Amino acid sequence: MLQAEPKTRHPMPDAILKLHSGRNLAYAEYGDPAGLPLFFFHGWPSSRLQGEILEKSAMKLGIRVIAPDRPGIGLSDFEPNRRLIDWPCIIEELAQHLGFDRFHLLGLSGGGPYALVTARALPDQVLGAMIVCGAPALAEFGKEGLLWAYRLAIWSQRNIPFALALGLRAAGWAAGRALNEWPMSWFSKLYPAADREALSDPLHHRVMMLSSRQALFGDAQALTHDGLIYCADWGFDLSKIAVPVHFWHGDADANIPLQLAQKTATAVPGAKFTIMPDDGHFSLPLLRTEQILRGIIA
């Protein structure tokens, strides 16, 4: 049986923007509706619903969070042959729709590259970017130390894509189980202590798993395409980023090794890199949210 958990708070209804391309872009809003604009880019596999992890701190600090679904994820329409460098135009269009002249970015895990490419492409509009547990430039720096599940997904997509599609559905089912139920009880043993503590909070667990299930039970082709973007050439030069970028990474991150994150950060001129002792891939964004967001309003 699924464990009863508290409902997530959804302050604003999901919104849909019809892009100039004719495709629909879905997004959710969190935090202070009159606050400082911040685009939140979700991880992989995840969705706009992950933005709720910022809700409490964003409301407290006066930040308005806009969390879009990437194409083909959640409620957004799929865009075949999409590249990482196609993302900034989508965000620019969304910003114009919302009336934002300037804004901040926060990329979590797989959302990190999307924040970096947007910072590169829109220097006159981006005030700064936060990269939290960010995915590294795999084509440039390699995959050594990357979580085994990520490496398996990359290999499967290239060799037996039908098996990956089945695996993603199975992962969606697993994400619906409580932490003390199989198979989550087994997977949780692979997490560092800080991650287990963070996910033991029923609300944290529900937000993270619900956002993942939204992606995992969606279009498998879109999700795998989104994943393959990370290991392809990103299509832009990190050294050309001209806005402030602050990387945050836990030294106990079992998903994305610290050394790969550091290599990516080193390629960004003037980037700040904060190492959080004992934090993992989940505890950092779930338990240190206010500390991270305070860096935006400082």
PLM features per residue range, with description:
Residues 43-56:
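The serine-hydrolase catalytic nucleophile loop
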Residues 49-52, 71-85:
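Glycine-rich "HGGG/HGxG" loop immediately N-terminal to the catalytic nucleophile
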Residues 58-77:
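Conserved alpha/beta-hydrolase
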Residues 149-152, 156-236:
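Alpha/beta-hydrolase
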Residues 241, 247-249, 253:
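Short beta-strand/loop motif that positions the catalytic acidic residue
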